[in-house]
């Protein structure tokens, strides 16, 4: 995960101070890209311990089309608690946009089901996109989408293996707390879609707009940079699962994850 540490290092060296919505203040860079070969291991940061259970259950929650934190709470995940209202609702956030985008004529569009169908029907299409950025719904969202657009790509490599890539565009990225989580989440999504579509995982490409370190995360970021990355773990997926929407936590296993200890930092709300 040297690619991730390089991002942290660049922000610390070149970031400019900017005010932000939370009032915390940031060091920020604009326009940055990382690439991860999923064949080299699952890109779960090893220079601090991440909560695998939260990563998996949040993605399952998105794929369910859910926008209430009840499912997350039932599974011991509290990462969305700060933004939910008293009934646990978040408004039309990721799950709604992914699975039930509201069309002007009253229809709802299941972007995830559509993109899987398209991968299977026309794998070399350049229209394999999913967007969570719906301007009409932004005012009703508890938090505007940070990771707002992703695109799949199918290609045959030099050995004739058909691979699935994914590129994420993230308009805003909390480099210390959020980015490691986002890397793992979209790498997992790539692996899952590849599995149900009979493809081999290829590259995960992570493109940022504003990538930043909050000013109260600087010491933690420097501590993380002082640690040497360890070998990446391997992800195993239950091969009996044929639908993306049937995935359960128990269908996934992470092998040989040996991270450095957790580094705590406050969440900017």
Curated annotation (Swiss-Prot):
BP terms from Gene Ontology: dTMP biosynthetic process; dTTP biosynthetic process; methylation
Residues annotated for dUMP binding in this entry: 21, 126-127, 171-174, 182, 212-214
Primary localization class, coarse: cytoplasm
A Pfam family assignment: Thymidylat_synt
Pathways per UniProt: Pyrimidine metabolism; dTTP biosynthesis
Top-rank taxon, per record: Bacteria
Compartments, as annotated in UniProt: Cytoplasm
UniProt keyword Membrane present: no
Stored PANTHER family: THYMIDYLATE SYNTHASE, THYMIDYLATE SYNTHASE 1
Subunit organization: Homodimer.
Name of the molecule in the record: Thymidylate synthase
Species the sequence originates in: Methylocella silvestris (strain DSM 15510 / CIP 108128 / LMG 27833 / NCIMB 13906 / BL2)
Taxon lineage: Bacteria, Pseudomonadati, Pseudomonadota, Alphaproteobacteria, Hyphomicrobiales
């Amino acid at each position: 995960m040297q690619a991730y540490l390089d991002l942290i290092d660049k922000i610390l060296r070149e970031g400019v101070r900017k005010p932000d919505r939370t009032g915390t203040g940031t060091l920020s860079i604009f326009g940055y890209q990382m690439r991860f070969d999923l064949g080299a291991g699952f890109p779960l940061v090893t220079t601090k311990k991440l909560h695998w259970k939260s990563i998996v259950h949040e993605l399952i929650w998105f794929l369910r089309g859910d926008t209430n934190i009840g499912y997350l709470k039932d599974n011991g995940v509290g990462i969305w608690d700060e933004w939910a209202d008293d009934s646990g609702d978040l408004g039309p956030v990721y799950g709604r946009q992914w699975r039930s985008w509201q069309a002007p004529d009253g229809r709802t569009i299941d972007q995830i089901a559509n993109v899987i169908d398209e991968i299977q029907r026309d794998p070399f299409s350049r229209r394999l996109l999913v967007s969570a950025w719906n301007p009409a719904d932004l005012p009703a969202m508890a938090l505007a989408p940070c990771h707002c657009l992703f695109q799949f790509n199918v290609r045959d490599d030099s050995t004739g293996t058909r691979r699935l890539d994914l590129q994420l565009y993230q308009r805003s990225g909390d480099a210390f707390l959020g980015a490691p989580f986002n890397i793992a989440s979209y790498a997992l999504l790539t692996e899952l879609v590849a599995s149900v579509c009979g493809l081999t995982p290829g590259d995960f490409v992570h493109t940022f707009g504003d990538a930043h370190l909050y000013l109260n995360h600087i010491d933690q970021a420097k501590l993380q940079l002082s640690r040497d990355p360890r070998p990446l773990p391997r992800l195993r997926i239950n091969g009996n699962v044929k639908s993306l929407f049937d995935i359960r936590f128990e269908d996934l296993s992470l092998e040989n994850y040996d991270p450095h200890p957790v580094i705590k930092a406050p969440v900017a709300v």
